[in-house]
């Protein structure tokens, strides 16, 4: 139902548009001219970011992505996270907190010799947040590049659209596309 709703709001007769909805998980709707919309989950959206942020800052979410933006992405951790089998599945596919949850996060960190407790080094905690943000951005970008490389616009809705760091990272991954929050579309 969501891709059809997105089609009615944002569909165009002359160009392909992608709507990325970033809530706990991220999903996209691919809106092609004269074709039925295609929608599927990409992977984690805010769920891992919010869980990690709350554990280390006491805040329910990373306001504007400022805390995560102060960290450094660990590329080796990111490559490992992207090896999660879900990312290789073809659409239509669905995921949720049954996969991308605190247990997944703990196991991922442990595989890199990191702790997930609040006693973690403050810089390491920011680096984890930055890496998780990059994971969400790359999961969305990979899905778009693979299934809608001709898209001209990526319209972002959901809570993730309020995370400036996440929006910046998505735009960096998709330089040939205009990435903007849905409120910019009216």
Regions found by a protein language model. Name each.
Residues 37-39, 123, 181-186:
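A short glycine/serine-rich beta->alpha loop
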Residues 14-16, 151:
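A general structural motif
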Residues 22-25, 152-162:
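Glycine-rich beta-strand-to-loop/alpha-helix junction loops that act as flexible
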Residues 1-10, 18-89:
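Glycine-rich phosphate-binding loop plus the immediately following alpha-helix
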Residues 1, 130, 134, 183-186:
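Glycine-rich phosphate-binding/hydrolytic loop that grips phosphoryl groups
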Residues 59-60, 66-153, 164-177:
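A contiguous, well-structured pocket-lining segment that forms one wall/lid of small-molecule binding clefts
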Residues 18, 178-180:
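Conserved beta-strand segments of alpha/beta enzyme cores
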């Amino acid at each position: 139902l969501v891709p059809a709703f997105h089609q009615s709001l944002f569909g165009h007769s002359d160009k392909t548009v992608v709507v990325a909805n970033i809530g706990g998980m991220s999903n996209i709707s691919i809106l092609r001219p004269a074709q039925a919309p295609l929608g599927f989950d990409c992977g984690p959206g805010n769920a891992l970011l919010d869980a990690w942020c709350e554990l280390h800052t006491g805040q329910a979410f990373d306001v504007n992505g400022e805390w995560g933006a102060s960290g450094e992405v660990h590329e080796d951790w990111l490559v490992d996270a992207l090896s999660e089998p879900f990312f290789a599945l073809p659409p239509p596919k669905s995921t949720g907190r049954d996969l991308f949850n605190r247990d997944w996060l703990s196991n991922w960190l442990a595989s890199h010799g990191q702790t997930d407790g609040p006693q973690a080094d403050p810089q390491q905690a920011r680096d984890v947040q930055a890496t998780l943000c990059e994971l969400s951005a790359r999961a969305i970008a990979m899905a778009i590049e693979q299934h809608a490389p001709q898209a001209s616009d990526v319209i972002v809705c959901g809570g993730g659209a309020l995370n400036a760091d996440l929006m910046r990272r998505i735009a960096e991954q998709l330089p040939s596309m205009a990435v903007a929050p849905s409120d910019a579309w009216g």
